[in-house]
């Protein structure tokens, strides 16, 4: 059983020639391996990107609560012209599907009411793409944006193994029945729970109770930040979400790649 639920969406750009403008949007639980597939270094799909090699990752979007959520985001990013979040924003022209077109679509998605409060991260691995992103203005809501050219290096140690070890530790600390620090009711094994991410605080709560306490002064469904009821530290909602799990989790996280991909647009062929 794999306890890590990391799943990201990514934007590729073809580097076949200096002026190549082909782009591709996909999703994966393992970006380094998926990039190798796109570039033909290992087998395993990615046939649609065969003619644009070599490819590089311009940016990744991650922090989704599960694979289904990531795939929903991926579909909307791939289909900006018909997505209900962007269909009124002039994304219908096929010739506009450049790197800037995709970044504008990404900006519209993360600024929408649906995703702006999700604990998402956007990491840029390419300076040019990051510069283009900054031209689009400030990102609102609960989204963090980073630039890190070396993000893929040590991916498994930084993301996969860290998450795996953290969740194993959480399971060990609450293997016995515990009570929610907010409602004082026993937390059942199949209920979502979240604990304070600080190691010197052992606060554990029902996820729903914690969300309600964070939303006492808000009219939204998803909170942004609040105070830990025990250590009194102010924390962002995303920090609590990183600790969420159930003790009865038995989901087998398989390496699943979405079949729905954005159509590759090679601008060189259109010239």
Curated annotation (Swiss-Prot):
GO CC, alphabetical: rDNA protrusion; Slx1-Slx4 complex
Domain GIY-YIG: 5-87
Observed effect of gene inactivation: Deletion mutant provokes rDNA contraction. Simultaneous elimination of slx1 and rqh1 is lethal.
Keyword Protein transport carried by entry: no
Location of the protein in the cell: Nucleus, Nucleolus
Highest taxon in the source lineage: Eukaryota
UniProt-recorded Gene Ontology molecular function terms: 5'-flap endonuclease activity; crossover junction DNA endonuclease activity; double-stranded DNA endonuclease activity; ds/ssDNA junction-specific dsDNA endonuclease activity; zinc ion binding
One GO term (biological process): maintenance of rDNA
Pfam families tied to this protein: GIY-YIG (PF01541), SLX1_C (PF21202)
ZnF bounds (SLX1-type): 180-231
Record keywords, A-Z: DNA damage, DNA recombination, DNA repair, Endonuclease, Hydrolase, Metal-binding, Nuclease, Nucleus, Zinc, Zinc-finger
Binding note for cofactor: Divalent cation. Mg(2+) is preferred. Has Holliday junction resolvase activity solely in the presence of Mn(2+).
Entry EC no(s): 3.1.-.-
Cofactor(s) listed in the protein's UniProt record: Mg(2+); Mn(2+)
Membership in a protein family: Belongs to the SLX1 family.
Task performed by this protein: Catalytic subunit of the slx1-slx4 structure-specific endonuclease that resolves DNA secondary structures generated during DNA repair and recombination. Has endonuclease activity towards branched DNA substrates, introducing single-strand cuts in duplex DNA close to junctions with ss-DNA. Has a preference for stem-loop (SL) and splayed arm Y structures. Introduces a single-strand cut in duplex DNA on the 3' side of a double-strand/single-strand junction with respect to the single-strand moving 3' to 5' away from the junction.
HAMAP family to which the protein is assigned, alphabetical: Endonuc_su_Slx1
Subunit relationships: Forms a heterodimer with slx4.
The protein, known as: Structure-specific endonuclease subunit slx1
Organism encoding this protein: Schizosaccharomyces pombe (strain 972 / ATCC 24843)
Gene that this sequence comes from: slx1
